[in-house]
Amino acid sequence: MLILLDQDGVLADFEHAFIDAWRKRHPDIEPVAFEERKSFHIREDYAPELRGLAEAIYTAPGFIRDLPPVPGAVEAFRELLALGMDVRICSSPLMQFENCVAEKYLWVERHLGRDATQRLILTRDKTLVQGDLLIDDRPVITGAARPRWRHIIYDAPYNRDQTDRPRLDWRNWRNVLAGELYRSDA
């Protein structure tokens, strides 16, 4: 089985790192709490006059590279490989890609090992990537093609209105994926 894992928000803890960076840069302005998030794009959860401040954080040199792993993500990645799954990291770089692209590779190397950089797929359109499952926190994924993969939503406050697909986090991933493996054998 070919499993595609999104990077930001699934493997790398973008959300909490953003909040920490916001508090350091703007201690006088309260950040939007993770549980209060409504939009996949973090800047859209801020008032228009604050969106530039938000964007400056996640496009800053070192931000993507220095993201901590989502708790349980590295262990799940390694366990999936040990189970014989073909696991790839499928990530969309930011439109402001100057720092992001290289830093995604550096993040993978730091947390998953140099060999894992061979498993990194960067694309603006995930529908063009082949796979059986895509685990992604983006609630709706559209593009040029009808994807072959089944979208499993990685749980986040901004995607909880989507109830038509399986949902997982790194605490329940074994149960959710066991159901998907059974489903693929049918």
Curated annotation (Swiss-Prot):
<comment type="function">
    <text>Dephosphorylates the 5' and 2'(3')-phosphates of deoxyribonucleotides.</text>
</comment>
<dbReference type="InterPro" id="IPR023214">
    <property type="entry name" value="HAD_sf"/>
</dbReference>
<feature type="active site" description="Proton donor">
    <location>
        <position position="8"/>
    </location>
</feature>
<dbReference type="InterPro" id="IPR036412">
    <property type="entry name" value="HAD-like_sf"/>
</dbReference>
<dbReference type="InterPro" id="IPR010708">
    <property type="entry name" value="5'(3')-deoxyribonucleotidase"/>
</dbReference>
<feature type="binding site">
    <location>
        <position position="8"/>
    </location>
    <ligand>
        <name>Mg(2+)</name>
    </ligand>
</feature>
<feature type="active site" description="Nucleophile">
    <location>
        <position position="6"/>
    </location>
</feature>
<comment type="similarity">
    <text>Belongs to the 5'(3')-deoxyribonucleotidase family.</text>
</comment>
<protein>
    <recommendedName>
        <fullName>Putative 5'(3')-deoxyribonucleotidase</fullName>
        <ecNumber>3.1.3.-</ecNumber>
    </recommendedName>
</protein>
<dbReference type="GO" id="GO:0008253">
    <property type="term" value="F:5'-nucleotidase activity"/>
</dbReference>
<keyword id="KW-0479">Metal-binding</keyword>
<keyword id="KW-0378">Hydrolase</keyword>
<feature type="binding site">
    <location>
        <position position="137"/>
    </location>
    <ligand>
        <name>Mg(2+)</name>
    </ligand>
</feature>
<dbReference type="GO" id="GO:0009223">
    <property type="term" value="P:pyrimidine deoxyribonucleotide catabolic process"/>
</dbReference>
<feature type="binding site">
    <location>
        <position position="6"/>
    </location>
    <ligand>
        <name>Mg(2+)</name>
    </ligand>
</feature>
<dbReference type="Pfam" id="PF06941">
    <property type="entry name" value="NT5C"/>
</dbReference>
<dbReference type="GO" id="GO:0046872">
    <property type="term" value="F:metal ion binding"/>
</dbReference>
<keyword id="KW-0460">Magnesium</keyword>
